[in-house]
């Protein structure tokens, strides 16, 4: 769900509980949403509850290293260098669980006993229990990551600080001078359902993406983000408007210079459901090499094999997965395969449509940091479509807000989050959850009153910050 709908659903659940007295079991990856709705929180790992307590216990005084890792993975706790802190490694297979504490192999604070014996539930207080040998009276005293306590104190009751370090003047100058890679001018994508009914999925949208830039598109479900991306990638032919790629207009029909073929190889897409995006009957090797063979991008077999091994290393995958099928991989591994497949094509632009929505918090952090590392190394442009506004704030340089098929606001990400001007943007940002139970319960959604028309003009408030009026 998008942020505003999610906030309304949570408020509805709380209202129903207040009126009827029902109990609610709320299962979620979203730690901000959990902070808003839950009285008690149970944290599970490898099929077992490893920590349980009141929301305040778990968020303000976490005791299990896995809980530390989950909270540290959130963008709100990104360090001064603008880096997330994902938990290393992958969850274990429940078909062959490891002995002792299942989290030990991923736990930097693991003790020798963690690899041998499963820890019991230790009592922290009357309401708080955690299954970690660190709570045994004989264990060495290891402090939780200080960043958790420091950042919670920083953000409680105040506006969040920027999640990533301010760019240097040199970086800003270089970005401004970067040439435009792709541009949409008055782009329209209409779908005629029947003779008297047409859906205006994208309606008069204009923006540009520079080389090496990360741009995000946000907005409610059905606002036209994905349709815009697919039209930009050439999956749909635009109903109206123009697309320019590297300064040349992309032809609607006849294509004597092969512009569309060039775009098909240089623009790659990564989808939300990595399972559906990978053919279940093919091996990972076949899946990754298929687009290269179709496009004949790399014809030398030895060069292709070397490039494949390089990509596996860059995306953190082992060569042993090449013989496996997608169903044998975890969600995070499948998404890494999808990223690797796109990188094999040596793209100029990657369009990622909700690429982390179905992943848990720590794996989300791993994938986002992988995106960031690869983008900095290879300098491809990146269009990031997401509902998770905290990740958008962390990752993107520029953000566009869409509503009913139109762009209503476009600005550098830092400026948009600190000074939103359009009422819809203000409503959307007010729905961002923070992992702080006491503060999250005080916050209220700014309701957006739908006008008869979103307006046809643009007002430039400052350099690169425009709002629809």
Regions found by a protein language model. Give the residues of each.
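P-loop NTP-binding/switch modules centered on Walker-like glycine-rich loops
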Residues: 5-83, 359, 363-437
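Helix-to-loop junction immediately C-terminal to a conserved catalytic motif
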Residues: 233
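Conserved ABC ATPase "signature" region
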Residues: 71, 302-320, 429
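Conserved ABC transporter NBD signature motif
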Residues: 241-252
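Charged, flexible cofactor/metal-binding loops and thiol motifs
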Residues: 55-180, 413-469
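Conserved ABC ATPase signature
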Residues: 325-329, 333
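A short, proline-enriched helix->beta-strand linker immediately N-terminal to the Walker B motif
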Residues: 344-348
């Amino acid at each position: 769900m998008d942020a505003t709908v999610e906030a309304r659903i949570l408020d509805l659940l709380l209202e129903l509980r207040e009126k009827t007295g029902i109990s609610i079991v709320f299962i979620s990856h979203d730690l901000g949403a959990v902070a808003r709705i839950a009285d008690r929180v149970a944290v599970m790992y490898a099929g077992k509850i490893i920590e349980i307590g009141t929301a305040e216990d778990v968020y303000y005084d976490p005791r299990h290293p896995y809980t530390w890792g989950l909270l540290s993975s959130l963008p709100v706790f990104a360090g001064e260098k603008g880096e997330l802190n994902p938990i290393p490694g992958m969850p274990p297979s429940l078909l062959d669980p490891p002995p002792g504490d299942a989290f030990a192999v991923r736990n930097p604070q693991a003790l020798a006993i963690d690899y041998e014996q499963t820890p019991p539930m230790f009592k922290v207080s009357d309401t708080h229990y955690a299954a970690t040998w660190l709570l045994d009276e004989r264990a060495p005293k290891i402090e939780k990551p200080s960043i958790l306590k420091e950042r919670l104190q920083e953000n409680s009751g105040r506006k969040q600080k920027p999640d990533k370090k301010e760019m240097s003047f040199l970086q800003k100058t270089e970005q401004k001078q970067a040439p435009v890679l792709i541009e949409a001018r008055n782009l329209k994508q209409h779908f005629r359902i029947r003779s008297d009914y047409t859906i205006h999925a994208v309606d008069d949208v204009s923006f540009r993406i520079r080389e090496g830039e990360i741009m995000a598109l946000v907005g409610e479900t059905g606002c036209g983000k994905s349709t815009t991306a697919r039209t930009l990638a050439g999956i749909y032919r635009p109903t109206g408007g123009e697309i320019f790629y590297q300064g040349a207009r992309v032809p609607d029909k006849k294509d004597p210079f092969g512009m569309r073929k060039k775009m098909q190889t240089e623009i790659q897409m990564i989808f939300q459901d990595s399972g559906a995006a990978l053919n279940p009957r093919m091996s990972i090797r076949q899946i990754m090499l298929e687009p290269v063979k179709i496009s004949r991008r790399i014809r030398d077999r030895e060069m292709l094999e070397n490039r494949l091994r390089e990509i596996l290393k860059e995306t953190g995958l082992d060569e042993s997965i090449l013989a496996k099928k997608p169903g044998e991989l975890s969600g995070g591994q499948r998404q890494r395969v999808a990223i690797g497949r796109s990188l094999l094509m040596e793209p100029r632009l990657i369009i990622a449509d909700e690429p982390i929505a179905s992943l848990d918090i720590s794996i989300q952090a791993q994938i986002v940091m992988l995106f960031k590392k690869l983008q900095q190394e290879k300098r491809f442009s990146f269009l990031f479509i997401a509902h998770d506004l905290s990740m958008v704030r962390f990752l993107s340089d520029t953000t566009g807000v869409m509503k009913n098929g139109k762009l209503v606001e476009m600005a550098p990400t830092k400026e948009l989050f600190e000074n939103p001007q359009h009422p819809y943007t203000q409503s959307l940002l007010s729905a961002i959850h923070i992992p702080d139970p006491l503060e999250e319960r005080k916050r209220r959604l700014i309701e957006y009153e739908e006008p008869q028309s979103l307006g046809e003009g643009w007002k430039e408030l400052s350099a690169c910050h425009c709002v629809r009026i």
